[in-house]
Amino acid sequence: MLSIKDLHVSVEDKAILRGLSLDVRPGEVHAIMGPNGSGKSTLSATLAGREDYEVTGGTVEFKGKDLLALSPEDRAGEGIFMAFQYPVEIPGVSNQFFLQTALNAVRSYRGQETLDRFDFQDLMEEKIALLKMPEDLLTRSVNVGFSGGEKKRNDILQMAVLEPELCILDESDSGLDIDALKVVADGVNSLRDGKRSFIIVTHYQRILDYIKPVYVHVLYQGRIVKSGDFTLVKQLEEQGYGWLTEQQ
């Protein structure tokens, strides 16, 4: 599904990613961990298509297409979803209007018929019930006045509605209490299937106790220096990153 080969990325002429390679197949859940400044958020921003991140080498393919040649909007149309650490607030725009606009943009990109207000309302009722979310979430302005947990619920709702093939969560657990963490984990777990993949970018292991990724990678100085299964998470919890960084 996603194939990253020898990726090099710079920000303001400073090299951040220095030869990162990663393959993600359908249905897999990968965790990207690492100390501060290792390049985790740079990887997320590059996959999302942020213009201020300059790719200086390597390739990124998504479902066989050159991802780096696609605009952020087209990447969303192809099936990539990004949940940011700090979701944007949009005053005056209701969640329902925002989600219908986003979904119909994706459907138009794929050559599918757009949904009218009534069909979309039926879809929303289905998703709200599935995720056990309060209905008033739909009438509120996007993320305005939301608690940390509510913002994460909104991310999960967006994923459920848009049904992306690859979901990237960029430090979505940052600053969250245990209840909000469970909101994120429960949402991710409810959307896991044999086709949808996840990349969980995090500095801490606590959210991974609930999501339990199949693959865990440690990023350091712009490269993946260690990969393993969930036992690597426990090892990092006990020993930190020092034993890995000292080997580099």
Predicted regions: what they are:
Residues 2-4, 17-19:
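Conserved structural motif at the start of ABC-family nucleotide-binding domains
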Residues 33-35:
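The feature captures the beta-strand-to-loop junction immediately N-terminal to the Walker
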Residues 59-75, 143:
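ABC ATPase NBD Q-loop/coupling interface
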Residues 14-15, 74, 182:
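Short coil-to-beta microelement around the adenine-binding A-loop and adjacent beta1/P-loop entry
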